[in-house]
Amino acid sequence: MNTMTNDLSGVVAADRAHVWHHLSQHKQYETMDPRVIVEGKGLRVWDAKGKEYIDAVSGAVWTVNVGYGRESIAKAVADQLVKMNYFAGSNGTVPGALFAEKLITKMPGLSRVYYSNSGSEANEKVYKIVRQISHRHHGGMKNKILYRERDYHGTTIGT
């Protein structure tokens, strides 16, 4: 880890004043500073005070499934961001089509992928897809959804 020599008190103050932390009770920040993570490598992260943590959350639930500091991935992403960072899913893109083709080889019996920006969006889209299938094949009579109670499905109202 690179030791941070900069004074991060301004960052901590800005965080405390302006950031709503996901899945957190903010009362605690009245008497203590929020933890500010400044660096990651592999499955480890370091906070502003230099304390090391094993990140057991981001890869399992959020977006860091391959760990931090993966230079080859960062370079590929940077190259694509310069070329074209995003275009609406209502149109095709070169990386989207090529990745879908590759992904389908790992999903026997399926022929299409749907890209979404989050797990919440994916869950809500699959609900709409299932409703459409039910309407087409069962006259709309099948309308129950199975889910695991008290499990994480996303942060939107629908999920």
Report each predicted region and the residues it spans:
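Active-site and channel-lining beta-strand-loop segments
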Residues: 34-56
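Conserved beta-strand and immediately adjacent loop positions that scaffold enzyme active sites
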Residues: 42-44, 112, 144
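Active-site-adjacent loop/helix segments that line or gate small-molecule/cofactor pockets in enzymes
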Residues: 2-41
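Conserved PLP-anchoring active-site segment centered on the Schiff-base-forming lysine
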Residues: 133-153
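Fold-independent oxyanion-binding glycine-rich loops
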Residues: 48, 118, 148-150
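Gly/Ser/Thr-enriched, mixed-charge loops and adjacent short helices
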Residues: 153-159
